[in-house]
Swiss-Prot record:
Described function: Functions as a transcriptional activator.
Identification of the protein by name: Zinc finger protein 398
Family per record: Belongs to the krueppel C2H2-type zinc-finger protein family.
Biological processes, Gene Ontology terms: positive regulation of DNA-templated transcription; regulation of DNA-templated transcription; regulation of transcription by RNA polymerase II
Residue span of region Disordered: 1-24, 198-225, 587-615
Transmembrane segment boundaries: none
Primary subcellular site in the record, as a coarse category: nucleus
One example GO MF annotation: DNA-binding transcription factor activity, RNA polymerase II-specific
Pfam families on file: KRAB (PF01352), zf-C2H2 (PF00096), zf-C2HC_2 (PF13913)
Length: 642
């Protein structure tokens, strides 16, 4: 029994040992291998798709760059077209203005021509016959009121008979009425005011064509009428003068009186009569007229005493019996002989053809060489400017209701009001929201966007976008300051600078801030102040990204990055970034000589080393020598530190 028991134990042990042996690993199935192959194929498909997409993106990028280039070219062409349209518009405006002026002058000439035709029909004016012009053109010879007037001295006037005095009065009155009939607002000549009887009006109604003859007192000899005088003048001249046949058409005779150009129709005359030294021969008039003019009238040609009409008797050359001379025509250039195609303007001396001379001389009709200093009007040399100045002195100067500025003329106030009223600025800038009152200001403003500076200073090379800026700059080179303050005597190179300076004396601050109670003298100061309320800082540093309110603050800040030191000390040679720092240095270190803080050798210090790239400049001006810091990047105007 004892031997039989161990046998089952050994069997159990062998079974346990066999159960404890490790099981064999399972072999991978074929399905897993197929899955791996499929995943690899899918990965290569995705890579190929990504590469195809990248190629498409690259193609689209190239097309986009090409389109951007074409867009830039189109924008340049569009800008060029806009510039051309603007230039054409300006030229068209100028042409329209010239056309309007020509139409006005044409209407004025038409009215004068109608008046002259009425004048000739009334026969109440002395008419000088002029030769026909080349190609039938109209000649012009200037003649004033005095050219057809005769003045007597006091002894000569007393020797005249009553009928001779009456004849003289009627002739002078006829000349004056002729000027009045041509719409000339002229004062009555002194000769008429003194010879006119008391109780008689200065001007009388003009006689009609039937009543145009000059009445004379009865005397032993028959009276002389205007028709008789015209009959003498209209007679044909002697053939020995060699004049060409007279033109049947009337010629225009251009004269001046009180600086107003006057067109008078006249009939043809021999060319020799235009010479200031050769008298004009006429056929002998009747005996009464012969005695009146040869014995009395032409005696005054040698008299130099004052006439009873307040005028000196001019020296006239002697004329033989039956001849009349017009010496005052000698002060004007005469038309050239027949055959010459060039004519000279007696106003400016230009040489023009005869058909162009008429149009050219119309431009002189509006010339007024004497401008009024207080208003845009111009006056002729004969006009009395003293009365106009007195009128300005008694007037209240026009004042702007918005800024209280005063102006010398209402038209300038009207133009100034456009500054306050933005709706009256019809010219907007296409590059910014600004608007302007006229095209010239818009053109000047657009040069700032285009960085165009066409006006260059010949002395220093600086360029300017405005011509007035160049002129003011050149006054600085010439030390010219023509505008002086009457209160403190300080001189300025421009009128606008003087006006801004005078606001200091008057306390005027026409630009108030709507957000606070502050007011400013200049508009740009108000704009800079408004940025404090809005938080706007439009000027950014390209190196560190710091933003500033004003442009000159940015320029000062950039000296830190560039190492620029534009303010050298004349004593020790040290240079400073800011002008205020140089002033502080001069006050502290130089009292008649170089201070202890300067280089004893008197040589300028070594140039600054490389800039510190990691310098923190947010809000503070850093002193690299450890002296102090100063907040100047904001609104303050103090200088920075070395």
């Amino acid at each position: 029994m004892a031997e039989a028991a161990p046998a089952p134990t050994s069997e159990w042990d062998s079974e346990c040992l066999t159960s404890l042996q490790p099981l064999p690993l399972p072999t991978p199935p074929a399905a897993n291998e197929a899955h791996l192959q499929t995943a690899a194929i899918s990965l290569w498909t995705v890579v190929a798709a990504v590469q195809a997409i990248e190629r498409k993106v690259e193609i689209h990028s190239r097309r986009l760059l090409h389109l951007e280039g074409r867009t830039g070219t189109a924008e340049k062409k569009l800008a060029s077209c806009e510039k051309t349209v603007t230039e054409l518009g300006n030229q068209l405006e100028g042409k329209w203005a010239v056309l309007g002026t020509l139409l006005q002058e044409y209407g004025l000439l038409q009215r004068r021509l109608e008046n002259l035709e009425n004048l000739l029909r009334n026969r109440n004016f002395w008419i000088l016959r002029l030769p026909p012009g080349i190609k039938g053109d109209i000649p012009k010879v200037p003649v004033a009121f005095d050219d057809v007037s005769i003045y007597f001295s006091t002894p000569e006037w007393e020797k005249l008979e009553e009928w001779q005095k009456e004849l003289y009065k009627n002739i002078m009155k006829g000349n004056y009425e002729s000027l009045i009939s041509m719409d000339y607002a002229i004062n009555q000549p002194d000769v008429l005011s003194q010879i006119q009887p008391e109780g008689e009006h200065n001007t009388e109604d003009q006689a009609g064509p039937e009543e145009s003859e000059i009445p004379t007192d009865p005397s032993e000899e028959p009276g002389i009428s205007t028709s008789d005088i015209l009959s003498w003048i209209k007679q044909e001249e002697e053939p020995q003068v060699g004049a060409p046949p007279e033109s049947k058409e009337s010629d225009v005779y251009k004269s001046t009186y009180a600086d107003e150009e006057l067109v008078i129709k006249a009939e043809g005359l021999a060319r020799s009569s235009l010479c200031p030294e050769v008298p004009v021969p006429f056929s002998s008039p009747p005996a009464a007229a012969k005695d009146a003019f040869s014995d009395v009238a032409f005696k005054s040609q040698q008299s130099t005493s004052m006439t009873p009409f307040g005028r000196p008797a001019t020296d006239l050359p002697e004329a033989s019996e039956g001849q009349v001379t017009f010496t005052q025509l000698g002060s004007y250039p005469l038309p050239p002989p027949v055959g010459e195609q060039v004519f000279s303007c007696h106003h400016c001396g230009k040489n023009l053809s005869q058909d162009m001379l008429l149009t050219h001389q119309c431009s002189h009709a509006t010339e007024h060489p004497l401008p009024c200093a207080q208003c845009p009007k111009h006056f002729t040399p004969q006009a009395d400017l003293s009365s106009t100045s007195q009128d300005h002195a008694s007037e209240t100067p026009p004042t702007c209701p918005h800024c209280a500025r005063t102006f010398t003329h209402p038209s300038r106030l009207t133009y100034h009001l456009r500054v306050h009223n933005s709706t009256e600025r019809p010219f907007p800038c296409p590059d910014c929201p600004k608007r302007f009152a006229d095209q010239a200001r818009l053109t000047s403003h657009r040069r700032a966007h285009a960085s165009e500076r066409p006006f260059r200073c010949a002395q220093c090379g600086r360029s300017f976008s405005l011509k007035i800026s160049l002129l003011l700059h050149q006054r600085g080179h010439a030390q010219e300051r023509p505008f002086s303050c009457p209160q403190c005597g300080i001189d300025f190179n421009g009128h606008s600078a003087l006006i801004r300076h005078q606001m200091i004396h008057t306390g005027e601050r026409p630009y108030p801030c709507t957000d606070c109670s502050k007011s400013f003298m200049r508009k740009e100061h108000l704009l800079n102040h408004r940025r404090l309320h809005t938080g706007e800082r439009p000027f950014s540093c390209p190196h560190c990204g710091k933003s500033f309110i004003r442009k000159h603050h940015l320029m000062k800040h950039q000296r830190i990055h560039t190492g620029e030191r534009p303010y050298p000390c004349s004593y020790c040679g040290r240079s400073f970034r800011y002008k205020q720092t140089l002033k502080d240095h001069l006050r502290s270190g130089h009292n008649g000589g170089c201070g202890g803080d300067s280089d004893p050798s008197g040589q300028p210090p070594n140039p600054p080393g490389p800039l510190i790239t990691g310098l923190e400049t947010s809000g503070l001006g850093v002193n690299t020598e450890g002296l102090e810091t100063n907040q100047w990047y904001g609104e303050g105007s103090g200088g920075g530190v070395l």
